[in-house]
Curated annotation (Swiss-Prot):
Residues 1-26 form the signal peptide. InterPro entries: AIM6_PI-PLC-like_dom, HAT_RTT109-like, PLC-like_Pdiesterase_TIM-brl. One of its GO terms (biological process) is lipid metabolic process. This is Altered inheritance of mitochondria protein 6. Belongs to the AIM6 family. The gene is AIM6. The keyword DNA repair does not apply.
Length: 390
């Protein structure tokens, strides 16, 4: 018969085996598990030590735990996921303590290199602005609608706007100001400003504002005098210096697209020396890639065209490319010459509307756009796929 020592050995071995079984299956903790741990105040931890895609995955997998029994999350603003994530990221941004190494940017994208990707329809993501920054996307986008001549709501369709929670200031300009203040606290008066990428603070985030409303002059006025004013006053927006005839790069570069005003009289508020009479222009036009003129070297920093327009210009058709599964040598040669022309004017380029299905076609065309054509910003909805293609 086995002695007491032998029985204990067998029992311990059994417990270890059971624990290993559950561990190997990757069982997610239940709400009961979280209930036992709620007193540890996990939702008050300032830094989990995760960044980029790992941070996003952690929040998605542990959302019940992170928000459990927190009264402040009972009323959602955007979504439970967004509200909890934003609160974590910006938790210390309002603090008077100046410590950029432990900032929102450090939590979002430390050890994540910026990638030449445009976060297309960024406002549709579960985490507008934050998800793109976590992946390192160096360009983002917001469609804006003028509501009651005083609010810029963000959304793709006018029928589904929320002028209270889903606004330009709550989703984009407000968080950007907090984030940038946090990493520029050590010398806020310096002309040198740190940007939104931890690994590359000198990289400017392209911020496309897509005008949707008919009254684009009023929309532009709201942008300049209300939504971007604090960013301008803090020195965070790239601008064209009218006196020096050069572009001065800053952490955020605003690009107007869609139904935007093109008149310099509107862009400069009727002044010869800029909107605020400071000899600075704080917004750039999304230049038409197929009809560029020398003037765009001062008015723009980027030029755009749709994939279908580009293929038509090159004597082809986007359906032919899709059926073939790739661009042929003639199409590549033609498109590359167009992009080279933009580069001669020191403009970045973006091609939107490329095939979105199937996945192998998307990957092939995307690689050709970046590597064969030499386009600067890969326009994709799927940031995970984009990160694997760059």
């Amino acid at each position: 018969m086995l002695g007491l020592k032998g029985c204990l050995t067998i029992l311990i071995g059994y417990v270890i085996a059971v624990c290993a079984l559950f561990s190997s299956r990757g069982r997610n903790p239940s709400l009961t598990d979280w209930e036992k741990l709620k007193d540890q105040k996990i939702s008050n931890i300032d830094n989990f030590g995760l960044t980029g895609q790992h941070l996003l995955a952690f929040f998605q997998e542990n959302l019940p735990f992170l928000s459990f029994s927190e009264e402040k999350y009972r009323h959602k603003h955007v979504s439970l996921y967004y509200d909890v994530f934003k609160e974590y990221i910006l938790r210390r941004a309002s603090s008077k303590k100046c410590l950029p190494v432990d900032s929102a940017i450090a939590k979002l994208n430390k050890d994540v290199n910026p990638m030449p990707v445009h976060s297309h329809n960024d406002y549709w993501r579960k985490l507008p602005l934050f998800e793109g920054l976590a992946y390192g996307a160096s360009s983002t986008e917001a469609d804006v609608w003028n509501i009651d001549e005083k609010i810029l709501a963000v959304g793709h369709n006018e029928a589904y706007l929320d002028p209270v929670e889903l606004t330009l200031d709550k989703l984009y300009t407000g968080p950007l100001l907090e984030i940038l203040d946090e990493v520029n606290c050590q010398d806020s008066d310096s002309d040198r400003k740190n940007g939104v990428f931890f690994n590359s603070p000198e990289t400017s985030l392209f911020f496309y504002i897509d005008f949707k409303s008919d009254d684009n002059e009023l929309t532009y006025k709201l942008l300049m005098e209300q939504y971007f004013k604090s960013l301008i006053d803090s020195g965070y927006l790239t601008y064209y210096d009218m006196k020096k005839d050069e572009i001065i790069w800053r952490p955020v570069t605003v690009i107007l697209t869609g139904n935007y005003p093109t008149s310099l009289d509107i862009l400069d508020n009727g002044n010869d020396n800029g909107y605020f009479e400071s000899s600075q222009r704080f917004a750039f036009l999304d230049a038409p890639l197929l009809s560029l003129e020398p003037k765009y070297s001062k008015l723009s920093v980027a030029a755009t065209v749709s994939f279908s327009q580009l293929m038509k210009h090159c004597g082809s058709d986007h359906w032919k490319v899709s059926l073939r599964g790739r661009m042929d040598s003639n199409e590549i040669s033609c498109a590359k010459s167009i992009i080279d022309g933009a580069h001669a004017l020191k403009l970045k380029t973006r091609i939107w509307g490329a095939p979105t299905w199937p996945a192998n076609l998307v990957e092939t065309i995307s690689r050709q756009i970046i590597h064969d054509l030499g386009s600067d910003l890969l326009n994709l909805d799927n940031l995970f796929m984009a990160s694997s293609l760059i």
